[in-house]
From Swiss-Prot:
GO cellular component, one term: cytosolic large ribosomal subunit
HAMAP family: Ribosomal_uL16 (MF_01342)
Function of the protein: Binds 23S rRNA and is also seen to make contacts with the A and possibly P site tRNAs.
SUPFAM superfamilies xref list: Ribosomal protein L16p/L10e
Chain's gene name: rplP
InterPro entries xrefs: Ribosomal_uL16, Ribosomal_uL16_bact-type, Ribosomal_uL16_CS, Ribosomal_uL16_dom, Ribosomal_uL16_sf
Source species taxonomy: Bacteria, Pseudomonadati, Spirochaetota, Spirochaetia, Spirochaetales
Keyword Ribonucleoprotein: yes
Gene3D superfamilies assigned to the protein according to its UniProt record, in alphabetical order: Ribosomal protein L10e/L16
Family: Belongs to the universal ribosomal protein uL16 family.
Pfam family, one: Ribosomal_L16
Name under which the protein is recorded: Large ribosomal subunit protein uL16
């Protein structure tokens, strides 16, 4: 179930930079527990899928899982042993641009201990530092 957009306006995009902390998607909105990233990074659809599979296997279909990031940026690459020039390479895979503080996954319907174990396991599948977070109760 590798995530990718159904259709895009432009096939190739410029790289850009990941600057600053997350101002959106930085709160636990849907579930009770979350996995938050602490570093700026481009997460690939395969990395997101690996973390999702690890989470689902750990909770054993017990709770509800939300994936809060979506890979919508194409990553282009030139073939091996190709000389420079002759235009931009073809799109290889899709990445999600995440800033520090972005919520990656949310979970609900399981105990706190199991949720923490599952989130730490999912975080170990990702090449960035992550932390476990809980929803703040509003009064």
């Amino acid at each position: 179930m590798a995530l990718s957009p159904k259709r895009v306006k432009y096939r190739k995009v410029q790289r850009g930079r990941v600057k600053g902390d997350a101002t959106r998607c930085n709160a636990v909105d849907f579930g009770a527990y979350a996995l938050v990233c602490l570093e700026p990074f481009w997460l690939t659809s395969r990395q997101i899928e690996a973390a999702r599979v690890a989470l689902n296997r750990r909770i054993k279909r017990g709770g509800k899982l939300w994936i809060r990031v979506f890979p919508d940026k194409p990553y282009s690459k030139k073939p091996a042993e190709t000389r420079m020039g002759k235009g931009k390479g073809s799109p290889e895979y899709w990445v999600a641009v995440v800033k520090p503080g972005t919520v990656l996954f949310e979970l609900m319907g399981v105990e706190r201990a199991l949720a923490e174990q599952a989130m730490l396991l999912a975080g170990s599948k990702l090449p960035i530092k992550t932390r476990f977070a809980e929803r703040v109760q509003e009064i």
